[in-house]
């Protein structure tokens, strides 16, 4: 593991523990935990959250967590995902394989497996997959975008033979928070500084072709689903969201773009995960309103 990956894991662990200190699971959410969606006993596990008094199939939000592809799991995202469930949604909160032990495209293949599980088990778990949405932050936003692009771009899909393509797996909309969407641009900008980290992700020294394959912004088509795209004035990946906004607009894709934070009250990377943060609460409310509007279409 590179020093960069080690630092990321350490800092993210400390930050997440501090953010969620004192959190108590809501009593009005039912959690079905540790359901297997693949062959890896450690990583291919997901939870399904429902509002406790809900009846009938519910619109479903699949959460794809962030963590720079080297950190994170469903436990870290339980507070955020259970909050979403309190708002009337079924929420699928999954872990996936991490680098450097599991290199790209392993996490993307896992997204494919979790979405396939959702569709195949919709009736059993009360999931309305006609209203299927993805939410992802940071690396999770990247994976959500890449997976959707694979479903809609035949040429891009050929790069990932381990991912099943099926129109049932295309989400009705995506909620993308503080994401990274074009690794090729980032690599050209940072050069050697980013190479050790990319080596962790890819399992070998990066090449132009390999890094381009990790850049879903370059493979978006005009039939991409509507997107609610979020960044903030303290987000170190902020430029990625602006670039993706331009791509989506040029392709004619419906996009709602929000840049949160004020000069005196900056908002950091993935600020929306802090359920105590009023600006984060505003962001989450905005995104769920977007989902409700998409459900009417």
Region locations from a protein language model:
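Alpha/beta-hydrolase superfamily serine-hydrolase fold, recognizing
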Residues: 1-297
């Amino acid at each position: 593991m590179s020093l960069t990956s080690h630092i990321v894991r350490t800092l993210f662990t400390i930050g997440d523990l501090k953010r969620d200190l004192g959190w108590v699971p809501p009593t009005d959410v039912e959690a079905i935990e540790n359901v297997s969606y693949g062959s890896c006993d450690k990583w291919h596990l997901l939870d399904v959250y429902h509002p406790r008094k809900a009846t009938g199939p519910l619109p479903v939000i699949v959460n794809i967590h962030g963590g720079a592809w080297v950190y994170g799991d469903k436990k870290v995202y339980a507070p955020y995902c259970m909050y979403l469930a309190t708002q009337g949604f079924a929420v699928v909160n999954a872990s996936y394989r991490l680098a450097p032990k599991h290199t790209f495209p392993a996490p993307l293949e896992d997204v494919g497996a979790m979405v396939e599980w959702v569709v195949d088990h919709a009736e059993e778990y009360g999931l309305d997959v006609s209203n299927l949405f993805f939410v992802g932050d940071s690396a999770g936003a990247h994976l959500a975008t890449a997976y959707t692009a694979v479903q809609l771009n035949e040429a891009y899909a050929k790069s990932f033979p381990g991912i099943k393509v099926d129109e049932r797996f295309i989400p009705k909309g995506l909620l993308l928070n503080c994401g990274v969407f074009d690794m090729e641009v980032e690599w050209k900008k940072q050069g050697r500084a980013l190479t050790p980290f990319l080596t962790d992700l890819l399992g070998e020294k990066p090449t132009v072709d390999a890094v381009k394959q990790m850049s879903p912004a370059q493979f978006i088509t005009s039939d991409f689903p509507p997107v609610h795209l979020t960044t903030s004035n303290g987000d170190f990946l902020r430029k990625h969201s602006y670039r993706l906004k331009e791509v989506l607009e040029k392709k004619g894709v419906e996009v709602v773009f929000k840049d949160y934070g004020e000069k005196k009250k900056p908002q950091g990377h993935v600020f929306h995960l802090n359920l105590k943060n009023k600006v984060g609460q505003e962001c989450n409310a905005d995104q769920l309103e977007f989902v409700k509007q998409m459900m009417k279409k």
